[in-house]
Design a protein with these regions (language model features):
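Terminal-region recognition feature
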Residues: 1-106, 112-312
């Protein structure tokens, strides 16, 4: 029985090593097809854009140093708007001439705020942005919630009042947060618009504050749902500066997306089978550790190549 368990663990380790190496190979392939420095800013679904992410990004950027052209591979489901704005500012500060952001499959909500820091956003057929609607936590509510959902609830409430549906109005009103919390929720939408406008006017719409304000308004209030899919065409329609992935990068970017998906599949499978003992948990989270290690390795590889090139 012990031998069987050992074989299973070795097989699992071999699979994780293979998937991790494939992801690294895909990253290096993408780097070869790119002009400028490539920075994988990947925040897995079990994490969010928060204070820890900010410190990690800052540490990475200090290692990378200022670059003329910075290409950011961005993946995240979102998180804190204030932190996302700060990360966007850092990316702008470390890219002297051009900042391109590639949504690596999904860059939703607060990650879309980060993407708005770019000079242009490069999207494939699978790339997806989302409305700027970060989930917030208020003392009066146990779970995180969408400020946009609160806004839509208030609009529905207003409509039902106009139609004289008193019972529906009473039921809806009882489920809403207290007035102070409502005010905080709605204020967060205005804060999101302001963050978007400031990042957009810094680079993408440099000097055109009116265009930046229009696009920010659409990203915050223009969609009915927090998870709405903003693909390439939709991003174009609302006025973002987007371009399709160049032909020479198309295969590499797809391999990268699929490679990351496989890493995440391995993690989810390991989590579903883990026990509560320390070694089992450690084994389950290894794909996340491998991911960070791969990111640091490709940063070091690019830095070494640049140093050799400058010495010549």
């Amino acid at each position: 029985m012990k031998k069987s368990n050992t074989r299973a663990k070795n097989k699992s380790k071999d699979l994780k090593d293979t998937v991790s190496n494939q992801f690294k190979d895909s990253l290096l392939k993408f780097i070869e097809s790119s002009e400028g420095f490539v920075y994988p800013l990947i925040i897995p679904p079990v994490q969010s854009i928060d204070e820890d992410a900010l410190f990690e990004v800052y540490s990475d950027l200090r290692k990378i140093g200022e670059q003329d052209n910075l290409n950011v591979l961005l993946y995240s489901y979102g998180g804190d708007a204030q932190t996302a704005f700060h990360i966007g500012r850092l990316l702008q500060a470390y890219s002297n001439k051009k900042l391109q952001i590639y949504p690596l499959r999904e860059a939703k909500s607060a990650a879309t705020l980060i993407a708005s820091a770019a000079d242009n956003i490069v999207m494939s057929e699978l790339s997806e942005l989302g409305p700027m609607d970060p989930q917030i936590k208020l003392p009066s509510i146990e779970r995180r919630f969408s400020p946009l959902a609160i806004k839509h609830s208030l609009e529905l409430l207003h409509g039902e009042i106009s139609n004289g549906h008193d019972l529906i109005v009473k039921t809806l009103a009882e489920r809403l947060p207290d007035p102070l919390s409502l005010g905080e929720a709605l204020k967060s939408l205005e804060t999101g618009k302001d963050y978007l406008r400031k990042l957009l006017v810094s680079r993408m719409f440099a000097g055109d504050s009116e265009k930046a304000a229009i696009v920010a308004e659409r990203l915050v209030l223009g969609y009915p749902d927090h998870g709405y899919c903003i693909d390439f065409k939709e991003a174009q329609d609302i006025g973002l500066v987007v371009q399709e992935v160049p032909d020479n990068q198309r295969d590499a970017l797809y391999d990268l997306m699929y490679g990351y998906k496989k890493m995440w599949d391995v993690f989810e499978f390991a989590m579903s089978r883990k026990d509560d003992n320390e070694s089992s948990v450690s084994e389950a989270i290894r794909p996340l550790i491998d991911l960070k290690q791969v990111v640091h390795e490709v940063i070091d590889i690019q830095k070494s190549k640049k140093n050799v090139s400058e010495e010549k």
